[in-house]
């Protein structure tokens, strides 16, 4: 395994952080493979070859999903945000902004950034 996914010396990192880094790398690799199959399928004229490629892509979807679930289980904050963004109706960016506000400031967030008012303003 290479060390290019690390920004800190790997031998100084605890085991769970190295595992997390490996799983992030695996997630990226699965996403790349999904994209590669999508490109191949877009050009493949032979139906039998396309069916085989589609089956392989489905396996990559499964691998990606397992990697993501592992990471979400190990990172509660990420999971909490993801649960409020994934598979929700409405504009994605809007849902993400609301999710961040809810997770950071609680469900009763007032929409502010929590920085405070100008000097002399009433609280």
Task: Indicate where each model-derived feature is located.
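Iron-associated oxidoreductase/ferritin-like identity signal
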Residues: 1-123
């Amino acid at each position: 395994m290479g060390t290019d996914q690390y920004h800190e010396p790997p031998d100084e990192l605890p085991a769970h952080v190295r595992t997390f880094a490996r799983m992030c790398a695996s997630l990226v690799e699965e996403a790349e493979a999904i994209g590669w199959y999508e490109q191949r399928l877009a050009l493949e004229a032979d139906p039998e070859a396309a069916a085989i490629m589609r089956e392989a892509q489905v396996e990559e979807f499964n691998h990606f999903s397992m990697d993501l679930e592992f990471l979400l289980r190990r990172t509660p904050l990420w999971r909490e945000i993801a649960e409020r963004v994934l598979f929700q109706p409405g504009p994605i960016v809007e849902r993400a902004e609301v999710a961040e506000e809810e997770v950071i400031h609680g469900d009763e967030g007032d929409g502010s950034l929590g920085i405070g008012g100008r000097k002399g303003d009433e609280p």
